[in-house]
Structure formats: structure tokens, C-alpha cells
């Protein structure tokens, strides 16, 4: 009896956590409720364990010391903790706390925008804008940009007035507070609109909120106060511009659309190559000579045989790229350029064939694209290429990457020795740090463990594959991480794999930025920067179907609005996916963008030229359309192109170099209808433009559907047994209408363009 009594007393006296380890305690904490108006986070307490705050997903509301900022509406925040017991540490799961606002009278409901406003205190009534809208802004450049966007949204005249002067909309920079670099405070009253922020970026994001509100209720906005800032500091999109070319005009539309949704990180893959070299090897061809590769920036680098590093089809001059980076900064978007080495580096190995990797490796048939990672000459070559853009350019007077801040060193999918890889990765990361840039790298160290140290302090890492890099390993090694998980966030357009674009609803309903593959980090972990979705153009070269940047616009923009909500907004989405998509439609495209090249009306264009060439100066027209011409080709010298219609968007060619009718797009891809115009005979020419298909009719009879020419000679040389040859051809063409007949040898009697 005494023995049983002793056991009972011991059980009652013992703490229930006495037998728990640090991890068990971390995931079973009891978090005290946060009272309204509390200024400090109440900490959980467990006997025998030390508990520290790790972080909060809204660090603007609960900082690293647990200080709580006031809120104007009830706001959920996730917090996590670090627990130490018996010399061992563990990180807790997320715990949601609710920060309560003082009770207020019911006012206007929260305006619906993308991403959702974090805090809103509704007022009564609305502010109405007159026929002329006045804006006062302390930043002249921002003021001009905002005014131009406002005119586009409202169709009204917008006038800039001096900072501090009476205006419909007054912008100001605030001192102190907890808004951070990207936060803003928007106050709408019956006497005007006031937008304040601690930094110009926050002001700019606030203008996007106002513009989205005005898109839905032109001329008025509801009274109330909004306080808004992002949940994650990095909200990104990666675009592979290497394996499929993209014109600068398209990238500017991407930037403006990112800004529309408050996305702020544009990662551009500058070099890459066709990765399925085995398709060449297995058919008796040499991929080193034949696989498609591109480096999209102007460079002075050349091989001993004169082979240029720069792509021959489409590239950006140093000035164009530097200007693009500066342009993006005006829209709150940081451009991160990537040079991918030592793998995916065919542009580099063609420059220096002697630096092809010689060690044992997996995927032997892909050796041609692998640089000799441990060779000092390889590291010297890659460093020199980076320096061409990271150091001051004599013509520009500044580095090409001056406004980038972050540069990406690539380093994914190297199939050689792990120590060689680690040596190379450490060298290129250290070089970027030495030049004053923050380097970013593809996570690969879980697949490449070893003794050679790889620098982590001040380094960002894309976590793209749990097989190559595990999230907790990356964090524990000291890297700042970005969720770029391939299974959730990768898109290879029109492929049978990596199709995040087919799962937008699932992404919207279920994806969380802190879940990376099968691992989950606390949402407020200080090393979790945010997330990025990626468009990879794997199906290039002999697998290219001819798809245009136009064809993937819906893929990009339709992913952006979803990721925006998930990365800026709270963990719980405010609407159903169907309601979200309705809102996307209501707010429309970003101001001053027309990515699908639609005309505002369906009125036809009719031209009867008296002579050629003739200026048309009409906007280019995207599908659907029908072009009808009556013309006569009077001469067709062999090998000489004849341009019928031209604009920055492309050229319609009456005669290509092979004599056929075709076109060249602004992405540099060329297409042929396979038919020739008769010489010395009047003919009726019709071009019918549809999404993914452009057709030719001559005198009312079908004369061909456009087919990609760029890689056609290669694909013909492969046997019909080559199962990867494209079975579908896409030939979207934006009809250029700036000039008619710039080099056409003949007469155009009549032209009609009809939007369909």
C-alpha cells in the first residue's frame, strides 16, 4: 500500500514534460493568449527548458524581441520558438496568435484587391474624384509613373502638384513606425486620399492598391484606413530566357505585371542549353557542335577560334540590360541575372573546349556542357565573365549589374565529383561576395556532401529539389532560403511534366510557402526569404514546337496572381479560387500593358497605298485576325528577303531567303508557310491569325500553315524513329502594322485587317 501511494504522489508531482525531449516540448507548447493592446508577446514557459522566440511571419507586427506593434484590425500572426533542453536544441512548429484591435463601429468592408490588404478599418462614405485628378508626391519619378498609370485606369486627366499642396491624392514619406521598406498606410476620407510609407517602395505598392480599387469602382474609393505590408520579403518569378528568346518589350510587360501584384524578384536565366544531348548522341550526332545554347548578354568574350559567348539569334546589349534593371527598380522589382555554370554551360565550353570536365560523372552523354569544376582556369574564366558585368563598364560609366544587388551563380545539376563541385561553388560565391553582391545559388549540397567548405554567410539558396538540397540542411548550414520546389512551382510550357500551371486551384487552396517538398519550416523562420515559381523552356532545339512568348502569357500571369496572394497575404486565402479568378478579371491587366495585343475596338483597318513603302503606325494586332491583301510580286531575286509588313513585334515576309512566304517574330524565331507567291501575277493573299496557329490562303485556297524553320533542318536529319520530334506545331504571329512594303518588290493594291 505504501509503495502504491508513493508512486501516485510521484506521478502527481512530476511535470508532464519531464520525459519529453526538446522537439516534443517545442511542438506541444501552450501559448498564452495575447490581450488587446498588448505590447509584448507573452512567452510560453516549461520547467527544465529554455525557450526563445525564433520569429514571426509578420515581423513588422512581432519583432525578434517579441515587441508587438499596434493593429487597426484583428490580424493573425504565426510565431515559432527555439527550445533548448539537456544541451539539445529544437525548433517548434507554427503557433497562430491573434493580435486584437480596439473595437470600432462597423464601416465600409475591406476593398478586394490582389494580394489582399492585411489590415482595414472601414469608414463611412466614399471619396469621389473629379474630372481632373491631382496628385502630390515627394518623389518626382514615382509621381510621373503613378499619374500615367492613373490616366490609363481612369481615362481622366491627372495633374501633378507640388509636394504638400492640396491634392486629391497626397503621398508622403513617414518617419519611424513599423511599416518597413515595403509597407504603407492608406487613409481615405471624404476630403482626400493620403498615402504614407517609410520608403518609396512602400509608396509604390500603395499606388498599386489604389489603382486596383479604382479599376473596380472608377471615380471613387471607399473611406477607411489600410495598413499593409508583405508576409515574405521575396516574392519571385524565374524566367528561362536562354533556351527560348524573349524580347525586351515582353520582359517589360512581365515587370509591370509583377508590380501589379506586388511581386518583387525577377530571376532571369541568361545562359543555358538544350539538355537532352543524348538525343543527338543516340542518332549519331555531336551535341557539342549541334545542341542549342545561348548566352543572352552582349559580351567581349570569344574563343580562340572566334566563337562568341554571346548568342547569335537574340541578345541584350549591355546598355539595354542595365536600362531594364533600372526600369524594373522603378516598379519595385529586383532583377537577378543568372550565369549557370559549371553545368548547363555549353556556351562556355564552346568558348574553351579544353575546359570540358574530364573526371568520372553520371550522364556521360551530357559531358559537353560540363565545365572542369576544380580547374583554376575554369574558375578564372567564369569570374572574368561575371566581372564584365559586375565591374564598371567603360562605356556605361557603371557596372551593367549596378542596380541588381543579387546575382545568381547557377551551379545546379553538375554530374561530376562532389569535392570538385564544392570547390567551384565556394569559389564563385566568394567572388560575388568580394565584388559586393549578394550571391544566390541552386541548392545542391545534400547531393554533394563533402569536406570542402562552401560559404553560406550572406548567401541565398533556391531550394528546388529535395534530392539535391534538403531545406533543414540548408538552414542549419546558414543559408537564406527561397522555396522554388520543382514539384509545386516549376512549369515547362506544353510539356508532359512540371506543369504547375495546371494546378493553380490546388496551389491557391493548399500550397504554403514554408512547406518545401516533404519538409516544413516555420513560416516566420528568419532564414526563409519567400518563394519563386519558375518557367523553364526545356523543349527547345529539335523539340521546339514554335510556341511564342504570347502563348505562355496566361501561364505566367495566371501563376503570378496566385503566388502573390500566397506570399504577400495571410496564410488563409480570403476568397474561394473561383472568387479569386473573378477578381483577377475585374482588376484586369496592369496599367499601360497590352500583352495580348488587343485593339480597343473591332473596327477594321483598310489601306489603298499609292506607293510603297507606306507608314501605317497602327498598333500590332494579336490573334484572332484576318489580313487580306491584293498584290503583285514583280521580282523575286534568289536569296533576298522581301518585307511586306514590319514593326518592332516582327516582320511578315512576302519572300523569305528560300523564296517562300513566312514571318519572323520579335523573339527571333522564323516560320514558313511552305508556299511561294507567283511572280508577275496579281494574287489575293490572306493571313488568318489564331492562337498557336497562323494560316495562309492564296486566291481563296489554303496554301499552308506556318511551321517553325529555326530547327527544321536538324530535325529532318533525324530518323522518323526519333520519338521526341514535335508532333504539334505552334505558330502564333502578332501582326506588325507599323510600315507596309519596306522592301517589297511589287505593288499592293488593297489591304484590309479585321480583328475577329
Swiss-Prot record:
Residues 588-614 are annotated as: Disordered. Highest enzymatic activity at temperatures between 30 and 40 degrees Celsius. Activity is decreased greatly above 45 or below 25 degrees Celsius. It catalyses: Hydrolysis of terminal non-reducing N-acetyl-D-hexosamine residues in N-acetyl-beta-D-hexosaminides. GO terms for molecular function: beta-N-acetylhexosaminidase activity. The active site is at residues 272, 344, 413. Its EC number is 3.2.1.52. This is Beta-hexosaminidase Amuc_2136.
